[in-house]
UniProtKB/Swiss-Prot annotation:
It comes from Burkholderia pseudomallei (strain K96243). Its main location: membrane. Its EC number is 3.4.23.43, 2.1.1.-. The keyword Transferase applies. This is Prepilin leader peptidase/N-methyltransferase. One of its GO terms (cellular component) is plasma membrane. Zinc is required for the N-terminal methylation of the mature pilin, but not for signal peptide cleavage.
Length: 309
């Protein structure tokens, strides 16, 4: 919950009464509720389309950087991956990963282009993964949820930013098994900055949350290593929980961890029972931490009480 502050909180100034301070947010707040909701959904869909770019390209960019470092250290030539030399989140244009067909503007419209193309590349007819429209729809729903919960305010934008980052990291973790520092660490600092004004937690609770989130899973990691001789959790998960602590405060961490643990155990057991994975096979924990963080952001303590807290 936002805490009182002696200085104006720019993240909570979206109501018409704060027109002078809010600027564009005040104008947005004056729009009919239906228009606000429609705008939020469209914004969420567009951001979801960009999240798909991040999920696809960021692991490739990181692999390139690792290989370049290895080549520099060993003097060996870097293997050619067949991609342009200039490859980042902005260039080159989006293209089919199978045939290289550069997508036109209408082929990049979130969700609608997937429906129009019937889930296949227009050029080579290779199926397009369902991940793309699902992430776009999830992003649109999260944007609408943030607006409904926090109203037309900076807090809603910040909440959606958190959810968008969690969505991107979850997809990357499920795809690759790791959480990039280039996402977890900026998310941690962003949480501390947002809570300078006590937007979601006091600054004190946010700092303690960042420290406690990291140390808690660090202890679990080393306890597991002492008992089993292996690391049962990745360091990216430590940084993600630290980031959630920075956003939501230390008081939210038990609920986040409980939701993540219960959801992870349930999914793992069902997947093992159905033969989708072996019992000893590692299951990415990042998506469950992200789900716990999003659930805590949107539902707060009552959600924890429903679980028996």
């Amino acid at each position: 919950m936002p805490t009182a502050s002696m200085t104006p909180n720019p993240f909570l100034s979206g109501s018409p009464e704060h027109a002078a301070a809010a600027g564009p947010l005040a104008a947005f707040a004056a729009l009919p509720t239906g228009m606000q909701l429609a705008f939020a959904i469209v914004l969420g869909l567009v951001v979801g389309s960009f999240i798909n770019v991040v999920v696809h390209r960021l692991p490739i960019m990181m692999k390139r950087a690792w290989l370049a470092e290895i080549a520099e250290a060993t003097g060996a030539p870097c293997a050619d991956d067949g991609l342009p030399a200039r490859y980042n989140l902005c260039v080159p244009r989006s293209a089919c990963p199978h045939c290289g067909h550069a997508l036109r503007a209408w082929e990049n419209v979130p969700v609608l282009s997937y429906i129009a193309l019937r889930g296949r590349c227009r050029h080579c007819r290779t199926p397009i993964g369902a991940r793309y429209p699902l992430i776009e729809l999830a992003s649109g729903a999260l944007a609408a949820g943030a607006l409904a919960l926090f109203g037309p305010s900076g807090a809603a934008l910040a909440a959606f930013g958190l959810c968008a980052a969690l969505l991107a990291m979850s997809a990357i973790d499920m795809q690759t098994g790791f959480l990039p520092d280039s996402l977890t660490l900026p998310l941690l600092w962003a949480g501390l900055c947002v809570n300078l004004w006590g937007t979601f937690a006091s600054l004190r609770a946010a700092v303690i949350g960042a420290i406690a989130g990291y140390l808690f899973l660090w202890c679990i990691l080393w306890l597991f290593k002492l008992l089993r001789g292996i690391e049962g959790i990745g360091y990216g998960d430590l940084k993600l929980l630290a980031a959630l602590g920075a956003w939501l405060g230390w008081e939210a961490l038990p609920q986040v961890v409980l939701i993540a643990a219960v959801a992870g155990a349930a999914v793992g057991l069902v997947a093992t029972w159905r033969g989708r994975m072996r019992f000893e096979e590692p299951l990415p924990f990042g998506p469950f931490l992200a789900a716990g963080g999003a659930a805590t952001l949107f539902f707060g303590t009552p959600f924890y009480l429903l679980l028996g807290g």
